[in-house]
């Protein structure tokens, strides 16, 4: 309750929808982030390896660091993401860059809660058809997720599958998913536009795209405080807890290099999604973008 109370005091939420469509959804993307690794410029073919090194380094302490950096608020942000997804029994859902399982576990818990209320605890055929796919390019992150799943009693292949894969070249069939989520992952891909295109491809008509990402603060005074916290405190905590200052320095820099809320919403729209909107949380520290494939 204290955490939710704190979130209520801190959260400055707003929802915005892009009302005017782009000139053409087939227009080539004008912004490429292929050569940025934080504030550094790197060869396009090197970025994936560099990002992989970051997450291999922080995998074992990833969830603990999320708690420390966000003062636990990331849990509420992910709850909000799942609330907007509104998962249902029998759905096929893809969670990309979700290696440690945080989003997938929440989706399954929500589905089980809905099912049990409706069926009074009876497992139905449609529940058995529910499948959540966790896709992550980093095997170390997936191993953390698999261990957590085992501790929660989830058997691999029964409602929950772990796939090592690239957000820019997914192995799933066209129109095979009811939902797609990506939390704190899309800013790390080499080509954001390719990841969005793949998300659009694998979704069914009527499928929902949702992205939870650290974004750009839109409250001037809070922005100054947040900048000091980001560049001074987060890397220091990373060094103290994870023994890795540089990875968390990259984290902070990658947030600043990521497109702002309006630009990213435009990119989602250009990928073909409709009814694109976003919701700022905690004054824009994070934003949840959503869109539908119609």
Curated annotation (Swiss-Prot):
Topology of this chain in the membrane: Peripheral membrane protein
CDD domains referenced in this protein's UniProt entry, alphabetically: AdoMet_MTases (cd02440)
Pathway: Cofactor biosynthesis; ubiquinone biosynthesis
Family matches, as InterPro entries: SAM-dependent_MTases_sf (IPR029063), UbiE/COQ5_MeTrFase (IPR004033), UbiE/COQ5_MeTrFase_CS (IPR023576)
Positions with a binding annotation for S-adenosyl-L-methionine: 100, 136, 166-167
PANTHER family assigned: 2-METHOXY-6-POLYPRENYL-1,4-BENZOQUINOL METHYLASE, MITOCHONDRIAL (PTHR43591:SF24), METHYLTRANSFERASE (PTHR43591)
Function summary: Methyltransferase required for the conversion of 2-polyprenyl-6-methoxy-1,4-benzoquinol (DDMQH2) to 2-polyprenyl-3-methyl-6-methoxy-1,4-benzoquinol (DMQH2).
Assembly and oligomerization: Component of a multi-subunit COQ enzyme complex.
The protein, known as: 2-methoxy-6-polyprenyl-1,4-benzoquinol methylase, mitochondrial
Species of the source: Oryza sativa subsp. japonica (Rice)
């Amino acid at each position: 309750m204290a955490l939710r109370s704190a979130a209520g005091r801190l959260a400055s939420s707003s929802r915005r929808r892009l009302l005017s469509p782009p000139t053409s959804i087939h227009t080539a993307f004008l912004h490429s982030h292929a050569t940025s690794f934080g504030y550094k410029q790197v060869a396009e073919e090197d970025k994936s390896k560099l990002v992989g090194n970051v997450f291999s380094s922080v995998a074992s302490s990833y969830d603990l660091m999320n708690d420390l950096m966000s003062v636990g608020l990331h849990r509420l942000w992910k709850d909000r993401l799942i609330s907007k997804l509104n998962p249902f029994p029998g759905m096929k859902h893809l969670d990309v860059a979700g290696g440690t399982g945080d989003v997938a576990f929440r989706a399954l818990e929500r589905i089980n809660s809905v099912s049990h209320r409706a069926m009074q605890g009876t497992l139905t055929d449609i529940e058995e058809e529910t499948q959540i796919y966790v896709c992550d390019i980093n095997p170390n992150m997936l191993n953390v997720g698999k261990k957590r799943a085992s501790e929660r009693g989830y058997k691999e292949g029964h409602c929950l599958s772990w796939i090592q894969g690239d957000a820019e070249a997914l192995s799933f069939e066209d129109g095979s998913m009811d939902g797609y989520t990506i939390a704190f992952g899309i800013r790390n891909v080499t080509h954001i536009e390719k990841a969005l295109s793949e998300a659009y491809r694998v979704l069914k008509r009527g499928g929902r795209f949702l992205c939870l990402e650290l974004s750009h603060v839109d409250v001037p005074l809070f922005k100054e405080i947040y900048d000091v916290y980001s560049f001074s405190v987060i890397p220091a905590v990373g060094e103290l807890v994870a023994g890795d200052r540089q990875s968390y320095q990259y984290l902070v820099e990658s947030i600043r290099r990521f497109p702002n809320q309006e630009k990213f919403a435009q990119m989602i729209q250009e990928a073909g999604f409709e009814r694109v909107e976003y919701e700022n949380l905690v004054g824009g520290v994070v934003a949840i973008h959503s869109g539908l494939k119609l």
